[in-house]
């Protein structure tokens, strides 16, 4: 064989890159749209990356409203588009027929879209690796390129806006995976066994450790045991066709007037396609009329409206198994239950709330991994003696902790990968408790890794709260725009007091 050779730098062609950190006073999405339009006006082939499908469509709509001449020359792009639509956009972008595209992470890698001159990042992508991957879409023909990172009113974004040196000093993160995640294994094993059957004693797959999953797959008809009893193979020829690489969950097809216009899966079905929800697709607006859970379909009608919708959610957490314990810090298996209870209608241009509507939908539940902090019963008295809101302090601390976790992990982790819930009185334990959990079925090891750096994690949370000059809490420190309870209650000063109490008895590492 040949000797290995270390490749420790990129050999890809690249010009100079001019990086701008933009922290607007007003809406960061409006600023991102204006920056994108400015680049187009200057003749720069441009791409804008957003952090959600809804913002992708909103920015596209705002751009076309502000500059109708760009219609047909710019497109939105995201998961949920039909395959033929995505291929057409990719081809038009590569050929130069399109001057720009507004995309989710769907165009971050894996698709050749040619050389671009400008990249607008509508929010910190969640990791250093993703930031440079997206920025790397520009300057591939050795021309200079501009990258504009627009800070959202979000704790992690504002941390880097205040500490740009920390951003540029950071290396690419490690990838955190959990190879024993049962939800992933149930999809992976049939695919693997369709290529090469599983054999008892295999050095790649520990069939003894995988026995419970293999048995379940046999029972459901996805795996078949060979006559010798020591091999297993897939019952389907192409099981990978049934697996979504973007997440775990059944795909629902979206129809308008009998025509299929898109698809959606996972928890997004309830959050973005409930009756009354506004579904945005390539600048067009549709109102969801029916969510058919039995036939995995969503029916909507096109509408011309001046608002969009945001789901209101509730959640509960149940302790299934305590695996690790150190003083008041615990880690183990949790079951989380989520429900969409209603939705806000918001003005399209200003994002102001118009009104609120209730909805009746089933809940969805998944088991995961997480940690929980049991707080002393006297802490409530200490907080309230200072005329502060105890429940608001717990809630604010939970938000700050979720935002801060990616900072000390040095692992690929976005705050959207983590969930949390706080209880002034937790029914299973009675004392107050705060839970932080992996936002994926079965868990992927994020919170477990967080335990290893819990001292740094708490310090990062404190820095996010205390660095922000606001008095009562804002989106830059303890508010979360995606909070299911609408950031109510929140108390920034109480969060600082609670954090200091927790730090007093939490070891640097567990």
Describe each PLM feature range.
Residues 1-198, 202-239, 248-249:
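Helicase motor core with emphasis on the C-terminal RecA-like subdomain
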Residues 23, 67, 405-407, 423, ...:
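Intrinsic-disorder/low-complexity coil detector
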Residues 68-70, 384-385, 508-509:
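Short, glycine- and charge-enriched coil/turn segments that flank and shape catalytic ligand pockets
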Residues 145-147, 153-171, 188-200, 210, ...:
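Extended Lys/Arg-rich polyanion-binding regions
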Residues 468, 473-477:
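Short cysteine clusters
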Residues 480:
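Cys/His-rich metal-chelating microdomains
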Residues 483-484:
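Short, non-ligating residues that shape and space the ligands of small metal-coordination modules
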């Amino acid at each position: 064989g040949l000797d290995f050779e270390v490749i420790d730098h990129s050999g890809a062609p690249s010009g100079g890159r001019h990086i701008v950190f933009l922290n607007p006073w007003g809406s960061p999405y409006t600023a991102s749209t204006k920056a994108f339009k400015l680049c187009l006006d200057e003749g720069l082939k441009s791409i804008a990356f957003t952090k959600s499908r809804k913002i992708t469509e909103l920015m596209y709509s705002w751009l076309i409203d502000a500059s109708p001449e760009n219609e047909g020359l710019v497109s939105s792009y995201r998961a949920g588009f039909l395959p033929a639509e995505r291929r057409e956009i990719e081809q038009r972008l590569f050929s130069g027929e399109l001057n720009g595209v507004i995309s989710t992470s769907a165009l971050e890698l894996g698709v050749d879209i040619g050389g671009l001159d400008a990249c607008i990042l509508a929010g910190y992508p969640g990791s250093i690796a993703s930031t440079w991957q997206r920025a790397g879409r520009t300057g591939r023909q050795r021309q200079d390129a501009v990258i504009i990172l627009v800070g959202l009113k979000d704790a992690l974004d504002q941390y880097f806006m205040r500490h740009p040196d920390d951003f540029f000093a950071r290396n690419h993160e490690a990838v955190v995976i959990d190879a024993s995640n049962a939800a992933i294994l149930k999809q992976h094993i049939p695919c693997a066994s369709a290529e090469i059957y599983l054999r008892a004693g295999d050095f790649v797959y520990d069939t003894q450790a995988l026995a419970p999953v293999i048995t379940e797959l046999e029972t459901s008809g996805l795996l078949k045991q060979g006559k010798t009893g020591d091999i297993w193979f897939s019952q389907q020829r192409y099981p990978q066709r049934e697996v979504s690489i973007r997440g775990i969950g059944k795909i629902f097809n979206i129809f308008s007037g009998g025509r299929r216009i898109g698809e959606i899966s996972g928890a997004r079905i309830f959050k973005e396609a409930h009756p009354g929800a506004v579904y945005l697709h390539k600048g067009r607006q549709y109102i969801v009329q029916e969510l058919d859970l039995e036939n995995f379909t969503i029916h909507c009608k096109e509408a011309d409206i001046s608002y969009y919708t945001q789901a209101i959610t509730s959640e509960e957490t149940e302790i299934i198994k305590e695996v690790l314990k150190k003083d008041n810090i615990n880690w183990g298996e949790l079951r989380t239950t989520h429900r969409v209870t209603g939705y806000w209608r918001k003005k399209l241009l200003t994002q102001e709330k118009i009104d609120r509507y209730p909805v009746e939908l089933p809940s969805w539940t998944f088991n995961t991994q997480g940690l929980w902090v049991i707080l002393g019963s006297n802490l409530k008295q200490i907080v309230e003696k200072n005329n502060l809101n105890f429940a608001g302090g717990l809630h604010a601390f939970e938000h700050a902790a979720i935002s801060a976790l990616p900072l000390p992990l040095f692992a690929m982790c976005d705050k959207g990968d983590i969930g949390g819930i706080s209880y002034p009185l937790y029914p299973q334990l009675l004392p107050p408790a705060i839970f932080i959990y992996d936002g994926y079925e079965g868990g992927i090891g994020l919170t477990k890794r967080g335990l290893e750096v819990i001292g740094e994690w708490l310090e990062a949370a404190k820095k996010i709260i205390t660095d922000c000059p606001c008095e009562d809490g804002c989106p830059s420190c303890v508010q979360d725009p995606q909070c299911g309870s609408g950031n109510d209650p929140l108390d920034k000063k109480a969060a600082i007091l609670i954090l200091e109490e927790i730090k007093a008895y939490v070891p640097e590492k567990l």
